[in-house]
């Protein structure tokens, strides 16, 4: 049963958040929301432990479609970074602000960039593209993520500065437009650079929050050097080009690891 510790801990964390928010906010939705997400993630981990081929994809679809279709389109909640800025500026700790605090600001201290690997609805689509591992050298254009970050902040700030009326409706259409833009750029970059995760590496503004916190992540893939034969197979299949043979926190692209475990599946010696 020890092998099921990780999914049990992950489920316990999300259930704790669910109960805490339900009690403090007096809203049963939080119990459903975080319980559903926690169960979906735990299910994916259990399927991985049982060597199910599409374990991570199951969780991606369960969580990604729930947040995109149900929360975003049906409930009309902008769960993108613009939604976070919007609720932050209004001083309301709801929806996107809670989502960002749990999944993208403090959550990475526990599970690193796990959001990117198991729940992001943008990556959910991009992972269906043909370039599972990058076929070109990494580009030095990661600074573009800060441009997108600043633009999203300026956009929402402008709504308040110029006292735009019906901000809720504007934010809903910003969610739709923003997602269409992300998908267009993500698919375009994937084919341009032959890399499904090019958008994640160069443009995604959310990584401005994720990367610094992921440096301290408790949940990390580590290498048992007594088993490693330096075959390089782990690096060849890594979608984020992380050097998994280096256990230090300063390893190459260390804050990029999305916990997809493709490296562990490819390792012939089970060193990861």
Where are these regions (language model features)?
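Non-ligating segments of multi-cofactor redox enzymes
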Residues: 1-245, 255, 265, 269-272
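Short linker/helix segments within small regulatory modules
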Residues: 247-260
């Amino acid at each position: 049963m020890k092998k099921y510790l990780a999914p049990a801990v992950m489920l316990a964390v999300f259930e704790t958040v669910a109960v805490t928010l339900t009690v403090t906010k007096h809203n049963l939705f939080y119990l459903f929301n975080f319980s559903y997400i926690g169960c979906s993630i735990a299910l994916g981990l259990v399927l991985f432990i049982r060597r199910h081929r599409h374990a991570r994809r199951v969780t991606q679809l369960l969580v990604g479609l729930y947040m995109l279709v149900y929360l975003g389109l049906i409930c009309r909640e902008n769960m993108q970074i613009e939604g976070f800025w919007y609720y932050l500026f209004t001083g309301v700790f709801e929806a996107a602000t809670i989502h960002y605090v749990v999944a993208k600001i403090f959550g990475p201290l526990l599970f690193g960039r796990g959001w990117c690997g198991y729940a992001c609805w943008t990556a959910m689509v991009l992972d269906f593209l043909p370039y599972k591992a990058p076929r070109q050298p990494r580009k030095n254009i990661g600074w573009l993520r800060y441009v997108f970050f600043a633009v999203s902040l300026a956009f929402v700030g402008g709504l308040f500065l110029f006292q735009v009326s019906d901000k809720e409706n504007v934010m809903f259409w910003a969610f739709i437009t923003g997602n269409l833009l992300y998908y267009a750029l993500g698919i375009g970059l994937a084919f341009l650079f032959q890399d499904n995760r090019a958008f994640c590496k160069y443009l995604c503004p959310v990584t401005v929050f994720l990367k610094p916190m992921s440096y301290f992540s408790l949940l990390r893939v580590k290498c048992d050097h007594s088993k490693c034969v330096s075959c390089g197979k782990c690096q060849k299949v890594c979608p984020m080009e992380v050097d998994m043979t280096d256990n230090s926190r300063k390893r190459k692209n260390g804050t990029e690891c999305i916990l997809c475990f493709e490296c562990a599946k490819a390792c012939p010696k089970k060193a990861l």
